[in-house]
């Protein structure tokens, strides 16, 4: 058994680590709440843009924007949203598993895949496993803006415009609740249609557009896709902070359990030392 002095040193070291993980847990909780607020703030704006797109598309029914036109899919683009840092449990590894599963499924059906990566962890992963990377960006921080990653988005939109890819998807972690985050693959292009959209397009709005509806649609559709990517990035950050908070709480709890174990070992070592000293005193007295 280790000596009492050595055990006390270990207890002190673990206690310092526990203070650090506790502080990191609190910071992650604070960042998660702020990111959730940004998530909520962007949704009404995105919903309203989508409504406007549907109205304008109805007004310019003779014009089929490439983003809204189905085509034969031979090559698929995917934007993979990951974190820059670790210490967030299995968040990235779960996302990578889902991404690889999705890519392999497409490849089994004869589709080629082009990839754009957001986040250092994704860059490192695809350098290791390989893949046709069209663009990447990292170091977005905890409060990114659309301008921070607009270059990567533009690369993929240009690839869609010129026919290099025929479909565009994004994969990111979906925030279910503080304890649960799961990988989610979402189609961006061509713009998916729902039954509700078909009902909406069946109505007529008599609006006058300035500039023309076609010009508005060209501009707004790009902004909408950029906003979809922004929402995915922000939601992924919320997932990162939630996972980090849980991981740090687990580390703090484990440190507490270790301290209890070492404290018990320290008490036993101290008791053994005292017993030894008493035995030596008694033995010395008996010798006299």
Curated annotation (Swiss-Prot):
Superkingdom as given in the UniProt entry: Bacteria
Which InterPro entries does this UniProt record tie to the protein?
Answer: ATP_synth_F1_ATPase_gsu, ATP_synth_F1_gsu, ATP_synth_F1_gsu_CS
UniProt entry keywords in alphabetical sequence = ATP synthesis, Cell inner membrane, Cell membrane, CF(1), Hydrogen ion transport, Ion transport, Membrane, Transport
Topological relation to the membrane, as annotated? Peripheral membrane protein
- Enumerate the GO terms in the molecular function aspect: ATP binding; proton-transporting ATP synthase activity, rotational mechanism
Specify where it is mainly localized.
Answer: membrane
One Pfam annotation reads ATP-synt
Has UniProt tagged this entry with the keyword Membrane?
A: yes
**Cellular localisation:** Cell inner membrane
GO biological process terms, semicolon-separated: proton motive force-driven plasma membrane ATP synthesis
Q: Which GO terms describe its cellular component?
A: plasma membrane; proton-transporting ATP synthase complex
Q: Which SUPFAM superfamilies does UniProt cross-reference here?
A: ATP synthase (F1-ATPase), gamma subunit
| Gene3D superfamilies cross-referenced by the UniProt entry | 3.40.1380.10, ATP synthase, gamma subunit, helix hairpin domain
Regarding protein family, the annotation reads: Belongs to the ATPase gamma chain family.
| Complex formation | F-type ATPases have 2 components, CF(1) - the catalytic core - and CF(0) - the membrane proton channel. CF(1) has five subunits: alpha(3), beta(3), gamma(1), delta(1), epsilon(1). CF(0) has three main subunits: a, b and c.
Per its database record, what is this protein's job?
Produces ATP from ADP in the presence of a proton gradient across the membrane. The gamma chain is believed to be important in regulating ATPase activity and the flow of protons through the CF(0) complex.
Task: Please give the name of this protein.
Answer: ATP synthase gamma chain
Instruction: State the organism named in the record.
Output: Legionella pneumophila subsp. pneumophila (strain Philadelphia 1 / ATCC 33152 / DSM 7513)
């Amino acid at each position: 058994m280790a000596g009492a002095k050595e055990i006390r040193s270990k207890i002190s070291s673990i206690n310092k680590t526990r203070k650090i993980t506790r502080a990191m847990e609190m910071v992650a909780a604070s960042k998660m709440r702020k990111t959730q607020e940004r998530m909520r703030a962007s949704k009404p704006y995105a919903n309203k843009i989508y409504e406007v797109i549907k109205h304008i598309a109805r007004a310019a029914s003779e014009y089929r924007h490439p983003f809204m036109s189905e085509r034969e899919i031979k090559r698929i683009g995917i934007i993979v949203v990951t974190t820059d840092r670790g210490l967030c449990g299995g968040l990235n590894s779960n996302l990578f598993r889902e991404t690889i599963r999705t890519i392999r499924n497409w490849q089994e059906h004869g589709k080629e895949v082009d990839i754009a990566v957001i986040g250092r962890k994704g860059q490192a992963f695809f350098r290791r496993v390989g893949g046709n990377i069209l663009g990447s960006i990292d170091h977005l921080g905890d409060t990114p803006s659309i301008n921070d990653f607009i270059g990567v988005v533009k690369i993929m939109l240009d690839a869609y415009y010129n026919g290099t890819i025929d479909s565009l998807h994004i994969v990111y972690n979906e925030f279910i609740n503080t304890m649960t985050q799961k990988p989610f693959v979402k189609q961006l292009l061509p713009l998916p249609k729902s039954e509700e959209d078909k009902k909406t397009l069946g109505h007529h709005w008599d609006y006058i557009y300035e500039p023309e509806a076609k010009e508005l649609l060209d501009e707004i559709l790009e902004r909408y896709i950029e906003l979809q990517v922004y929402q995915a990035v922000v939601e992924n950050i919320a997932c990162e902070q939630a996972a980090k908070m849980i991981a740090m709480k687990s580390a703090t709890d484990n440190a507490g359990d270790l301290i209890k174990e070492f404290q018990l070992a320290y008490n036993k070592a101290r008791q053994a030392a005292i017993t030894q000293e008493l035995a030596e005193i008694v033995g010395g007295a008996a010798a006299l």
